């Protein structure tokens, strides 16, 4: 089955139409298929298995946030758990999950819907997007009162999600007490294995891109798209995520309570060994999963 999301707008020379294809058979419901590095996959899987707390996935529109949340729900879905989602719109139907679609015309907004959901005795709540203070406040309160809450934000990186919630007006001590972790992501095109080619990168380009010589390898090598019949001459087949994951450690929570800016949070994350978006992307470029150009395109 294929669902279509259609947007039209009148322009000077006629209608501009955008059609988004949602192919149910192609949705990834396995976290390990999304592109998480093994260590990040382990950390992310551990926090979504917790009984309560707030888990956020952040990134721009079209970066795969909803797919990641669906995969997370599929992993923790269990007949003994009551899972309720509120989305705009419901993109895919999940077996065993109570899914609600917002409808502002009748007053069913994220905030009002979430307020009703917490009275339904759920174990796990997924909020499609935190757009305002009211939704953020209810989500945090739900996470503090024994529910696992998963949601998304539109920010450039994981640290920015924390700053955004504080700027919305969420109390710092409540956020520090409820937050489990934040994952940031982008989507890059995956190289066709049938025609990709390897080339040496000159030292200047390697330095500018952030690629370093690894394990005595010299010069740095990357992969490029070519095109063949298998990939319809595009050089790419499908897409894969690049990720960064920020775990809410005690030190991180101290910064939240102090209302520190995203830069300070990012610096602490770096000292704690967090792999940022570009670093994960560069590793995928080095190993031939995608191209250097793709990584730079989505992380600039």
Language model: regions and residue ranges:
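Short, flexible helix-loop junctions that flank or precede catalytic/ligand sites
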Residues: 1-300
